[in-house]
Amino acid sequence: PYDPEGARALMEEAGMADFEHELISIDDDWRRSTTDAAAAQIRDAGIPVRRTILPGSTFWNDWAKFPFSSTNWNHRPLGIQTLQLAYRSGVDWNEFGYSNPEFDALLAEASSIADADARREVMGRIQAMILEDGVTIQPYWRPLFRHYVDGFVGLDMHIAYFPNLWFWGRAA
């Protein structure tokens, strides 16, 4: 929930009320705007924040090393795949630097369960842990669309934003 006073109180309790946070984003339209909105909410709490906007050629060289940056993750066929790529201890794309042996054990358990309904219970515990540990700020899931005109077939949007070029063609 949006609680600027509570956020400020937590920073004061930690002795970091005057610490200036740097929020880094790539110079594009939606990630820049999303990070600007996050910075505004931090400022609403009276917490100092500096925005740094980098060109893609600079941002992507160090994206996983910034202490606070905005990135995006597109959908994977299984929800657990993003967790394996981005949250498991020691993996290259773990931009959060998150390391929790209990999380890793639950992730291994969930990965071993073939039945989606059985896996759902473990995934719920994993997702609660990410929330409770404050690992990431996830403001929204970005909708992806593909626009095309009549007369073509096979242009449906793939859930992972993957273009299935071999299905594209002209309608008969």
Predicted regions and their residues:
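Short, well-ordered beta-strand elements
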Residues: 18-27, 49-52, 70
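Short, well-structured beta-strand/strand-turn elements
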Residues: 43-57
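Detector for C-terminal structural segments
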Residues: 27-41, 59-172
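Structural transition elements
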Residues: 1-12, 30-33
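Short hydrophobic/charged patches on amphipathic alpha-helices used for structural packing
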Residues: 8, 57-60
